[in-house]
Design a protein with these regions (language model features):
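Preference for protein termini
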Residues: 1-218
């Protein structure tokens, strides 16, 4: 009813399907979740440190901890970024993990999502739907709000934008387009965060400046 979809182009029944939501949540004890969140944060710091090294001193390669072919053989390695120092030393700005329970009840990370992790927009929409389906339960249980996460994301992106004085930074949400499997989330987050939703063809470079094409020009 809310129009939430996830595009599945390998599905012979169609190019998209409704987003499935079980209104009954998976219950995780606070103590258990504290361990999970701490471990995931530690993992994110490790991956950020690895990126900083691979685009910096490359100690992991020189000491034989990682084979150079594993790094340089990847098309995703950005050679122009070699030697740069990002603001705050943060290379990994968005990170997600796929979690699963092991047979003995422990949590396992089965996938790291570092390139374009999806799910934040769907999580927000899920939360809104559940709050409408179970309004009293949602209120009485003092469910933690997600708004702080998105506010931090807005502030974090704004802090990365080089501006002068009181000038507001120009931030956009880049999407491959409506045929991407998570395009709904791109459009949803664009509206929620207040960032224009753009495709690569909407941008153009002039010297060291990136411009957004609009009906009024650049």
């Amino acid at each position: 009813e809310n129009g939430v979809t996830y595009n599945v182009y390998a599905d012979p029944s169609g190019s998209d399907r409704p987003w499935a939501l079980d209104p009954l949540p998976l219950i995780i004890a606070p103590e258990e979740w504290a361990k999970v969140s701490t471990a995931v944060a530690q993992r994110a710091k490790l991956l950020n440190a690895m990126l900083a090294d691979l685009y910096g001193d490359q100690t992991l390669l020189s000491e034989g901890l990682l084979p150079p072919s594993l790094v340089f053989g990847q098309h995703g390695y950005l050679w122009p970024c070699r030697g740069i120092k990002p603001i705050g030393g943060i290379w990994l700005h968005n990170y997600a993990v796929d979690l699963a329970r092991s047979p003995d009840g422990q949590w396992w990370v089965i996938a790291d999502r570092t390139q374009a992790p999806s799910g934040a927009g769907y999580a927000l929409e899920n939360r809104l739907v559940v709050s409408q389906v179970f309004p009293e339960m949602f209120r009485d249980l003092h469910v933690q709000h997600l708004a702080d996460f998105f506010h931090d994301q807005q502030d974090g992106l704004a802090a990365l934008a080089p501006v002068e004085g009181d000038e507001q930074p120009h931030i956009v949400l880049l999407t491959p387009g409506p045929y991407n499997e998570t395009y709904f989330e791109h459009a949803y987050l664009s509206r929620y965060l207040g960032f224009p939703l753009v495709e690569g063809q909407d941008l153009t470079g002039r010297g060291e400046t990136l411009y957004l094409k609009t009906l009024r020009g650049l």
